Amino acid sequence: MKVILLGSGNTATVLAKMIVKAEHEVVQVWSRNFDHAKALAAKVHAKPVTTLDELTSEADICIMAVSDAAIPQLAKQLHLRRKILLHTAGSVSKDVLRNSSPNYGVLYPLQSLRKEMMVIPPVPFLIDGNSDEVNALLEDFAHSLSDNVEFADD
């Protein structure tokens, strides 16, 4: 799958490494700080982008790995037609993404992640999509990253 990452902090960095290890492709990285986006993009051979308008339509999944507080504001700026839009927060409802994409959900890592990790331990995920189709794709994607995947419900 082709993935866009929004964010460049701990969660985004570890997810980027996991995504590449699972033989998916991180195609773009966006961050409020372009230097941070460039640094993460370089690690995974992705393209850093300066604005959300530059996001490619070729990606399958767009992951918002930003602070919980930033999710609602960032979601308001996104209008994705076909992509699955995910956030990584356990305390934020998936429905905050409702107006940003018809296909949305949560990919929540049940473990603290640090970008400095040299070895990434097995990370359990809770997932929750807004439809059966999204849940099926999200489950396949999450299982490519981890053996420990469970469904959650808002």
Segment roles from a protein language model:
Residues 43, 119-154:
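Internal alpha-helical scaffold of NAD(P)-dependent oxidoreductase catalytic cores
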Residues 3-6, 64, 127:
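Hydrophobic Val/Ile/Leu positions in short beta-strands of Rossmann-like dinucleotide-binding domains
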Residues 1-48:
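NAD(P)+-binding Rossmann beta1-loop-alpha1 motif at the extreme N-terminus of oxidoreductases
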Residues 34, 44, 48-118:
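Rossmann-like NAD(P)(H) cofactor-binding subdomain of soluble oxidoreductases
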Residues 1, 83, 123:
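Nucleotide donor/acceptor-binding cores
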Residues 35-39, 93-95, 132-136:
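Short, charged/polar "capping" segments at the starts of alpha-helices
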Residues 12, 37, 71, 135-138:
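A general structural signal for well-ordered alpha-helical segments in protein cores
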Residues 24-25, 83, 102, 147:
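Short phosphate-binding/catalytic loops that engage adenosine nucleotides
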